[in-house]
């Protein structure tokens, strides 16, 4: 009897929140409100998420956990798959001003039936790295757009 193989890929990206001085500046509070809004309505960030539930097990106002239910179009994750995602704003951050704000997104991808080190695994690493970086940038751009449009007041 053979053992099923599974490929696991971990990646993290940090993107500046206020990179472009010509764009409206986001404060930490505004960005956190935007993350909450997107967590309750993930389709606003990504069409490949069908639904979400913010779980009631938060330990503080600076963190929450949500369950995502994937839709069609998710890379390497089938429709209907449920994922748990932890979201937190690190405690004890020093406020060095808006230029010092970053979003760090950490992803862990599990892909069954792919051999670690195989060509398919390397292809997934390349594709998922691009997707993860793009997702982090999209979150920042979307929250900034909500601020400009007045949508953060609804969050």
Swiss-Prot record:
The gene is ataL. It comes from the Eukaryota. Pfam families: AtaL (PF08982). This is Acetylaranotin biosynthesis cluster protein L. Pathway: Mycotoxin biosynthesis. Nonribosomal peptide synthetase; part of the gene cluster that mediates the biosynthesis of acetylaranotin, a member of the epipolythiodioxopiperazine (ETP) class of toxins characterized by a disulfide-bridged cyclic dipeptide. The first step of acetylaranotin biosynthesis is performed by the NRPS ataP which produces diketopiperazine cyclo-L-Phe-L-Phe via the condensation of 2 phenylalanines (L-Phe). The ataC domain of ataTC then catalyzes the formation of bishydroxylation of cyclo-L-Phe-L-Phe. Disruption phenotype: Impairs the production of acetylaranotin and accumulates chemically stable intermediate cyclo-L-phe-L-phe or shunt products such as 2-hydroxy-2'-ene-cyclo-L-Phe-L-Phe and 2-imino-10'-hydroxy-cyclo-L-Phe-L-Phe. It comes from Aspergillus terreus (strain NIH 2624 / FGSC A1156).
């Amino acid at each position: 009897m053979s053992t099923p193989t599974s490929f696991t890929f971990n990646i993290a990206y940090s993107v500046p929140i206020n990179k472009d001085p010509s764009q409206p500046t986001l404060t930490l509070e505004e960005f956190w409100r935007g993350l909450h809004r997107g967590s309750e309505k993930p389709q606003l960030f990504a069409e490949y998420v069908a639904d979400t539930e913010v779980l009631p097990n938060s330990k503080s106002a600076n963190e929450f956990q949500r369950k995502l239910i994937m839709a069609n179009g998710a890379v390497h994750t089938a429709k209907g798959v449920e994922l748990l995602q932890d979201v937190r704003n690190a405690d004890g951050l020093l406020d060095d001003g808006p230029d010092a704000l970053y979003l760090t997104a950490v992803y862990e991808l599990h892909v069954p039936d792919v051999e670690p080190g195989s060509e398919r695994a390397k292809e997934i690493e390349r594709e998922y790295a691009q997707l993860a970086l793009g997702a982090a940038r999209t979150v920042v751009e979307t929250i900034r757009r909500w601020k400009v449009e007045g949508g953060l007041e609804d969050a």
